[in-house]
Amino acid sequence: MTRAAERGQGATGWGLRGALMAVALLSVLNAVGTVFVLYQWRELSAALRALEAQHGQEQREDSALRAFLAELSRAPARVPEPPQDPMSAARNKRSHGGEPASHIRAESQDMMMMMTYSMVPIRVMIDLCNSTQGICLTGPPGPPGPPGAGGLPGHNGSDGQPGLQGPKGEKGAVGKRGKMGLPGATGNPGEKGEKGDAGELGLPGNEGPPGQKGDKGDKGDVSNDVLLTGAKGDQGPPGPPGPPGPPGPPGSRRAKGPRQPNSFTNQCPGETCVIPNDDTLVGRADEKVNERHSPQTEPMITSIGNPAQVLKVKETFGTWLRESANRSDDRIWVTEHFSGIMVKEFEDLPALLNSSFTLLHLPHYFHGCGHAVYNNSLYYHKGGSNTIVRFEFGKETPQTLKLEDALYFDRKYLFANSKTYFNIAVDEKGLWIIYASSVDGSSILVAQLDERTFSVLRHINTTYPKSKAGNAFIAQGILYVTDTKDTRVTFAFDLLRGKQINANFGLRMSQSVLAMLSYNMRDQHLYSWEDGHLMLYPVHFSSTAPSQR
């Protein structure tokens, strides 16, 4: 305990010593600062007294000079006397004996003024020269001063005269091809060219209307030959047996009993048949139906080949079309979006790839992605109506056809994936329209058209619900329907026989939006518009008879 107490007392003593030393150091610094401040104060006081003395001396000199100048300004001005002759001057010298004294005073005054001026500050001299006139004489001009700082830039001057044209420059690089301009004026007809080679044999045309009855011909000459009727001869021997006849149509199956075949009838269940306006078409339509119901089998699609991409555009919806009938017509037509009034016409495939086109203005707005081109005419759905428009290229007046009881409003699309109410199709058997009925609102129907009169020959009800369909196309008189994802063909219907047939094959692997799907009989390819990708699919047919359900 004693050692701990000693250690505590020692620590306390060292702390007190340190505090005392700090206080002493502060006191010393304070004293030194006080002495330094007093020294500075003394120096500043001496400088202030010197400045006050100098200022007082300047004031005294200034007041003395001002008094002298005031006295000088009150002195009378000396007027110069006219020159005198020598005799007068002599008399004046004799009569004015005291003049030399005044001359001496003037010299002394001048000397005093010079001495006074030499003691005057420059500022006072400047004030004196400015306030009085005649005392300060103007000296010679001084040397020129240094150049001043540059001034602000002036205003822009007016344009000068155009210079001479320079030499022609070097030829630049070839620029990008510009857009096609407006059509120019019609030029003069050129010279008649040589006759070209004969083209390929085209498809047979449609049967023309019967001609007018001709005039009665002239009466023929009287024949001089006399034909006598002979007696009836004996019966000849029997001939050899003839070749076997063609097989008859298949009979109906009656084993299943309850199930009825889905055959076509003229009643059009759930739909009103359109009767052609021309009475002569009734017999002709029956002939065509009987013709196409012949026992000859139509080829059926068995598979779809690998696709080839033609072009990529930015629009999700659209159609690209080629002429189906005329093989020599290489034009391509493109509609962008599922609604519009403009059509792009390309001269050929290279023009499509180079985006070189001509804009065509349609007479009515189109809707959907189910258009078709057939015999130089564009077939499309007139937006907001149940009307199909036939617009012949190069003509201004279109033709229209109404489909009664067809869905065309309230977004109850035939194919929701492509925003389409009507899908026009062209194949080897003619012109078709795929649509949905507004009576039941669920089944897919097909109307067969007479292309010559632009009228409906008959309506075919496939009884297949449109809710299960993604898109559809027609080839060789058979309707093919895809699933809702547009990846497989899951339904087929023979439109010529009015019966469903077995079909199930893959279409594509992509899950993109399939806005357009159309068969072209010209090259037997499927044309599609898939989320801006313009694609081509080769079609493979089978010649065997399709199995029916």
Curated annotation (Swiss-Prot):
It is a single-pass type II membrane protein. Residues 213-222 have a biased composition (Basic and acidic residues). GO terms for cellular component: axon; cell surface; collagen trimer; extracellular space; plasma membrane. Residues 237-250 have a biased composition (Pro residues). Residues 260-269 have a biased composition (Polar residues). Keywords: Cell membrane, Cell projection, Collagen, Developmental protein, Differentiation, Extracellular matrix, Glycoprotein, Membrane, Neurogenesis, Repeat, Secreted, Signal-anchor, Transmembrane, Transmembrane helix. The keyword Repeat applies. Residues 137-195, 196-222 form the Collagen-like domain. Homotrimer (via collagen-like domains). Interacts with NRCAM. Interacts with NFASC/neurofascin. Interaction with glial NRCAM enhances interaction with axonal NFASC. Interacts with MYOC. The olfactomedin-like domain mediates NFASC/neurofascin and NRCAM binding. This is Gliomedin.
